[in-house]
Amino acid sequence: EATYFDFNEEVLSGIIKDAADMGFELFLLDDGWFANKYPRDNDKAGLGDWNYNKKKLPHGLGYLVNESKKKGIKFGIWLEPEMVNPKSELYEKHPDWVIGQPNRPLDLSRNQLILDLSNPKVQDFVFGVIDKTLSENPGIAYIKWDCNRFVTNSGSYFLSPEKQSHLWIGYVRGLFSVLDRVRAKYKDVSMM
């Protein structure tokens, strides 16, 4: 968070060097590294579009992972895969993937909505985000898995009307399913 959303590859490389010189063990790339159509330059857009920002990181995440490795420190990445901004490609494609009650306005908190992990398609998407990020950048050693808002307006566009009371159970089971899949494939990657 030393740079908030205002950084580029050169700035981050300098921070990695400084961190290594001070004896740090890990560099964590926080929020703002992703999204292109709606760049993540503030907290109002891009959340959910988990492709590295080509303007900020023209050589991709792998470049920074390698810079960290060269300096002898581990590389960590910030993700908040359960959340989405309405101003994102993900929300444009899948507005029915969020938690909300039919026939009621959506309730934004921190400019974001919550993805409905009771939906297996959402579970696959969230796992896919993590899987793609880690498989394309095998030197990532740590995931900071953020979740910065509380659930309001709870309802599921996926669950039938009779099953709406099962949202919480389905959500937690869906989250645990994703975490189990990540842990099974990436045993050596720490998550918080």
Can you name each region flagged by the protein language model?
Residues 3-92, 121-128, 170-177:
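Aromatic- and glycine-enriched glycan-recognition loops and surfaces
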Residues 53-60, 64-70, 92-192:
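Active-site neighborhood of glycoside hydrolase catalytic domains
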